[in-house]
Regions:
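Histidine-centered divalent metal-coordination motifs
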Residues: 162-164
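Alpha/beta enzyme core
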Residues: 4, 10-27, 34-158, 167
Length: 167
């Protein structure tokens, strides 16, 4: 669930989603995507089981500090934390809604190692050239698959790729 959906739908809708998830026999999580600390606090209060702190537009040091704060809040309550390092591109003019950036800052393997070690995040969204939003006709993202392989070799948490579907 994206933060803009949280604001639009409100708590009653979220409670129905959580009830449906809890009633199914299929293992699932209720995940809050691309969020700040305030929305994450609300999501945890409401019963989400997974959150994504997106401080990727901050400095490396601030991203670490913010992510650590969220991990310290979430983990004691059994909530998993996804973080983002580097910036995902956006094909949308409204990058806040899209969750992307106008310029991609690729994730550096050595920073990914340090980030995961310092934050204790459960999974890491990395930037390898994907972009949020509908890809314009003829648009071909330039994916750095070797960078993905390098990061996978050195990081011990699952990696997440946002913006990979072109929609």
């Amino acid at each position: 669930i994206h933060p803009s959906e949280l604001k639009f739908q409100g708590d009653a809708f979220i409670q129905q989603v959580i009830k449906a998830a809890n009633d199914t026999k299929i293992p699932c999580v209720i995940h809050l995507d691309h969020s700040g600390v305030k929305d994450i606090e609300r999501a945890i209060r409401d019963g989400f089981t997974s959150v994504m702190i997106d401080a990727s537009h901050e400095s490396f040091e601030d991203n670490v500090a913010i992510t650590k704060r969220v991990v310290e809040l979430a983990h004691p309550l059994g909530v998993s934390v996804e973080a983002e390092l580097g910036t995902i591109g956006s094909t949308d003019n409204d990058t806040e809604v899209a969750g992307g950036a106008t310029n991609i800052i690729y994730t550096k393997p050595e920073e990914a190692v340090k980030f995961v070690e310092e934050t204790n995040c459960d999974c890491l969204a990395i930037a390898i050239g994907t972009a949020h939003g509908l890809y314009p006709k003829g648009f071909k993202p330039e994916l750095k698959l070797e960078l993905l392989k390098e990061i996978k070799k050195v990081v011990n948490v699952p990696l997440v790729l946002h913006g990979g579907s072109g929609n």
